[in-house]
Design a protein with these regions (language model features):
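Well-ordered beta-sheet/strand-loop patches within structured domains
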Residues: 1-61, 68-339
Length: 339
């Protein structure tokens, strides 16, 4: 698949006037032609449609309004775009030669997940990725199990920066969020009373607090939602549901601490269940429907490759050349090394 993608992009980049013939240049040319026209006649329907097409090929909110983000992309020269394509062609060379017959592909700057089987796209959904200071890593691994009604073992960094300060302000904060405290990170660690932690906080600096484990059980407040999809890796990154559905309405979706939030986790689960006959789908639905159910892990009979990539320029499934914001500044870093 990556070989075909490389071939497609090479054919595109060698085509004469690739950028000047594209929709972004059409929009720019129309704007320049109309500069001397009275203001009320400048922005006609044709130009609005050209702007909308331009916004779609750049991952922007397609409203036809030439806002700051749209202006930023319009102001990119043909030379800059060709260099961006070259950077991504080089990046494609680093990808696995064979992604497998069935795999999950996540392109970070596109904020999108696709599940592909025999070159057909089975699923296509919006995702939320890591913010700039907590970037989602680029790597490949294999999904081996799914966790229903997951507990959230809150990372130590989040505990110290967010949870403990809130606990100091409100002693009932943990109870209101369904968060329990344990003596350590072992699964058999003893539970600790909130008062004990508060006493420790009062006597010590937050950074000196012992390594308690803060765990949030299954609930509507749990940031992992009702399910997570695990492909064990050194980055501790996984795919998961989220209660913050409104974020998927945004064009720019870099908000997480590194994990990938799914807009349609139920569809991914359903697709996996349809093809993995070793899993009792009725039991799965029962677990998800009952609020009293505890965390439950379900193994997959066949592991599914997961590839997390970073392409700011690519050809989509419709053969359209796409550009995206360099959200982690990786293009700038690579450009210094290449040019």
């Amino acid at each position: 698949q990556s070989k075909d993608l490389n071939k497609t992009c090479e054919n595109v980049i060698n085509t004469e006037n690739i950028v000047t013939n594209s929709i972004e240049e059409q929009a720019t040319e129309q704007i320049e032609e109309k500069e001397s026209v009275p203001c009320e006649e400048i922005f006609d329907e044709d130009l609005k449609n050209a702007v909308i097409s331009f916004q779609k090929t750049h991952g922007l909110f397609a409203d036809g309004i030439v806002g700051l983000q749209t202006q930023k992309f319009l102001n990119k020269s043909a030379k800059e775009k060709i260099e961006q394509i070259r950077l991504n062609l080089e990046r494609m060379r680093w990808l696995p030669r064979n992604f497998g017959d069935k795999y999950i592909l996540i392109n970070i700057p596109e904020y999108r997940l696709r599940m592909i089987e025999n070159n057909d796209i089975k699923l296509n959904m919006a995702v939320v990725v890591g913010e700039r200071k907590h970037p989602t890593p680029i790597f490949s691994d294999k999904m081996s199990y799914i966790v229903l009604n997951p507990n959230w073992n809150i990372p130590e960094s989040i505990t110290k920066k967010e949870i403990l300060p809130k606990l100091l302000k409100d002693p009932n904060y943990l109870a209101s969020k369904g968060i329990d405290i344990y003596q350590g990170w072992h699964k058999d660690s003893e539970k600790v009373e909130t008062t004990e932690v508060l006493d420790t906080l009062i006597l010590q600096d937050i950074d000196s607090v012992p390594n308690f484990r803060f765990t949030q059980g299954p609930s509507d407040e749990n940031p992992l939602g009702r399910m997570k999809f695990m492909f064990p890796n050194k980055h501790a990154v996984y795919l998961h549901d989220t209660p913050a559905k409104s974020l998927f309405n945004n064009a720019r979706r870099a908000y997480s601490h590194g994990c990938i939030r799914l807009s349609k986790p139920e569809e991914l689960l359903s697709t996996i269940l349809d093809e993995d006959k070793t899993i009792n789908s009725e039991r799965v639905n029962q677990i998800l429907s009952e609020e009293t159910e505890k965390e439950k892990a379900i193994g997959l009979s066949k592991k599914i490759p997961v590839h997390i990539i970073y392409l700011t320029s690519f050809v989509d499934e419709n053969g359209k050349l796409q550009f995206r914001e360099d959200i982690y500044n990786y293009d700038k870093i690579q450009e210094k090394l290449m040019f």
